[in-house]
């Protein structure tokens, strides 16, 4: 009888789209097309022309997150081959990107407030039948993409998708969003689309062993890669998970914006971003600390540090429901998260609007408006989550920026007090073009770009939320400080960095008022068994 094997807990999984690290804008056809032509090609062309400039830039901490390929100036021929192959194999997406740009230009010159009907004949051929032309109430022209149809068209090709397996033993990992993943001797490249059930079977091996021959057949790997595949397997069983069975609520912080709540047999996981298991000086929860079944995964928004396919694909087999905010249907900058997850093989995707609720026993989850942090773009697929479990209430506001304090006053009048606030305070976010640049069809002025940033709340804005909801606890999170997040985050704080000084002031202000406050880092566990009496909170904003 063949020996049974588990997947090792330190197997690193990189989901790829045409060998680029997969993040939410690389999967919907329209945003994928724009990123290929206006991000990937630009980076590859630059590297081919001047590889040493890239090699020097990646050594400079100030350049972290910039458009530089991290291969030390080497492997230029492989990058050139990838570029040329992409141009050949993704000609449809290149045409789609060009058509989006041409359509935008046509509307700017031809749509002057009169009927748009005659302009349908001028729509570029790749977009005919996939867009509706519209005005807003001020007669500004735009178009609405038929996104469900695009997923069923020649513009969506799951064969673009694959997974690269390797092993990791430390938090030291290069930034991945600007460097394509090339083949290497110690990596196993699995040509699996993200909706493949084989992916679920693969990650079930983390807790359920199978014979070698079944694993090999499942992955369809050639005999020449047997030794490599065996490096990722072990006969040793992982430790069993102990679910929380107490009478109240347990929440655990896994790093960044990832928090697991367990109560009365129901589990909720917010913005899953998990570390692998290996010996390291910083204590953390990992995949080993997840329950066998996760009732609800809740996503706040579609930035790459909140929707991490590297984590989500590994836990998909555990997830009963994934809850996402509803988008502005048909806009380029706001692709549907429901369609995204459905096309990536997730079942039971629940799309909810602001103030919609999910009720499951004594658990109520309410979607709350999320302002800011999206460079003033008209993006609706962002949501804060209010979780009420019996007498307890926790508000996960993610990167919400309190640019309109009256919003929270209206919400408090409707929803009442909240026990604990979780708030991101990256108040010096990247400019508009860093994330959304490929979607823009016109050059943005530098001053305009710098003024529109992906920024969260500062101290004054955060304290207003604490005061408005009479919070007893305030936790700063989603700061990207955990070292195992370096590969997707481009922040390197010092004690003088504004997000640190602003969050320090918020924490100190809260403590002076008897409010429990902390900037979360690494791991934390809190048990909520009996609700303590509420401490009075000052009704007026304490200014920073």
Predicted segment positions?
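Pre-active-site segment of Zn-dependent metallo-hydrolases
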Residues: 2-200, 231-246, 254, 258-302, ...
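Metallo-beta-lactamase
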Residues: 224-244, 327-392, 508, 512, ...
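Active-site-proximal beta-strand elements of phosphoester/diester hydrolases
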Residues: 250-253, 267-272, 364-371, 393-399
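Active-site neighborhood of phospho(di)ester-bond hydrolases with catalytic His/Asp-centered motifs
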Residues: 269-272, 293-307, 323-327, 395-400, ...
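Active-site environment of divalent metal-dependent phosphoester hydrolases
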Residues: 277, 303-307, 329-332, 356-359, ...
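Active-site HxH/HxHxD metal-binding segment of metal-dependent hydrolases
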Residues: 285-353
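Active-site-proximal loop/helix segments of hydrolase catalytic cores
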Residues: 310, 371-468
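Short acidic, glycine/proline-enriched helix-loop-strand junctions
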Residues: 443-444, 448-454, 458, 464-465, ...
């Amino acid at each position: 009888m063949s020996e049974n094997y588990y997947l090792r807990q330190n197997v690193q999984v990189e989901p790829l789209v045409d060998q680029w690290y997969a993040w939410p804008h690389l999967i919907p056809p329209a945003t994928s097309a724009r990123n290929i032509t206006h991000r990937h090609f630009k980076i590859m062309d630059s590297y081919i022309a001047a590889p040493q400039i890239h090699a020097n830039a990646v050594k400079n901490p100030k350049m972290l997150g910039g458009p530089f390929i991290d291969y030390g100036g080497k492997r230029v021929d492989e990058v050139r081959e990838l570029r040329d192959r992409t141009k050949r194999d993704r000609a449809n997406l290149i045409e789609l990107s060009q058509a989006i740009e041409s359509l935008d230009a046509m509307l700017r010159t031809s749509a002057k407030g009169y009927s748009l009907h005659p302009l349908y004949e001028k729509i570029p051929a790749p977009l005919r039948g996939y867009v509706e032309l519209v005005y807003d109430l001020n007669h500004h022209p735009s178009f609405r993409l038929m996104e469900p149809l695009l997923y069923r068209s020649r513009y969506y090709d799951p064969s673009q998708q694959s997974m690269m397996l390797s092993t990791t033993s430390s938090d030291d990992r290069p930034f991945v969003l600007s460097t394509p993943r090339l083949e290497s001797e110690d990596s196993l490249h699995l040509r699996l689309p993200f909706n493949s059930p084989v992916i679920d079977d693969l990650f079930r091996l983390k807790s359920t062993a199978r014979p070698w021959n079944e694993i090999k057949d499942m992955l369809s790997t050639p005999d020449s890669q047997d030794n490599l595949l065996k490096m990722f397997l072990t006969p040793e069983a992982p430790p069993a998970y102990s679910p929380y069975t107490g009478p109240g609520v347990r929440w655990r912080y896994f790093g960044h914006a990832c928090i697991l709540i367990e109560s009365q047999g129901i589990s909720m996981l917010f913005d899953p971003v998990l570390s692998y298991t290996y010996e390291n000086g910083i204590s953390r929860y990992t995949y080993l600390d997840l329950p066998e079944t996760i009732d609800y995964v809740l996503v706040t928004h579609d930035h790459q540090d909140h929707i991490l396919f590297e984590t989500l694909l590994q836990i998909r087999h555990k997830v009963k429901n994934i809850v996402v905010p509803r988008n502005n249907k048909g806009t380029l900058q706001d692709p549907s998260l429901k369609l995204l997850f459905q096309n990536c093989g997730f079942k039971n995707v629940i799309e909810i609007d602001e103030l919609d609720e999910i009720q499951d026993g004594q658990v109520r989850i309410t979607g709350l408006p999320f302002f800011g942090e999206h460079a003033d773009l008209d993006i609706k697929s962002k949501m804060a989550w209010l979780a009420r479990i019996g007498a307890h209430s926790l508000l996960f506001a993610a990167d919400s920026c309190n640019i309109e304090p009256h919003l929270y006053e209206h919400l408090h009048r409707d929803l009442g007090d909240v026990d604990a606030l979780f708030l991101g305070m990256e108040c010096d976010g990247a400019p508009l073009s860093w994330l959304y640049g490929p979607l823009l069809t016109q050059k943005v002025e530098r001053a305009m770009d710098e003024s529109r940033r992906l920024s969260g709340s500062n101290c004054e804005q955060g304290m207003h939320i604490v005061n408005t909801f009479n919070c007893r606890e305030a936790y700063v999170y989603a700061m990207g400080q955990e070292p195992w997040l370096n590969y997707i985050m481009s922040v390197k704080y010092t004690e003088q960095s504004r997000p640190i000084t602003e969050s320090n002031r918020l924490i100190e202000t809260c403590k002076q008022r008897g409010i429990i406050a902390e900037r979360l880092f690494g791991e934390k566990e809190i048990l909520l068994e009996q609700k303590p009496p509420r401490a009075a909170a000052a009704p007026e904003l304490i200014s920073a």
